[in-house]
Amino acid sequence: MEDTFICRIATLTDMERKWEYEIARHSDDPGNWIVWKKGALANRSEGRTLPYYGLLNGEIICEATAFIKPDPDEDAEGLIDETTAYLCAFRTNPPYRGKGYFSKLFAYMIEDLRTRGYERVTVGVEPEEVVNKQIYAHYGFTEFVKTDTETYPDGTVINVEYYAKKI
């Protein structure tokens, strides 16, 4: 039997399933993940995000989220506007990494955003995440936008560099 991989915009039911998986996977310290789940569901319900999921034989194996409207509590200058979407939550379940599934999901997401009128996408990365920076550069994120900080629900503050690419 041949494997079936599909990409789609997640339903709230899909999101519940995926977030429960992430919380269980981070069971040693689920606090941030529980707060992020609540925010992700609210952002989707309020039309601020488009969550994209890749499913292999019905199992959610990878994801990415596009913020298409800024959160009123966040500084989205240069990151989100009428023609710019902010991409985040790039995750692939460990057994499926390096097999091209996320690349297919990414291409699907970019094409969907393009058809919705978006012309530019942005990403954020911590300066010390060298491998992620290389991956983003490979995907074309080479235009430096700005540096800022992000505060996690537990109070941890991280530095973030933001990059953009035209689509």
Regions found by a protein language model. Give the residues of each.
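Acetyl-CoA-dependent GNAT
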Residues: L12-T13, I23-A89, N93-P94, F106-Y108, ...
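Conserved N-terminal entry element of GNAT/NAT acetyltransferase domains
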Residues: M1-R17, Y21, I167
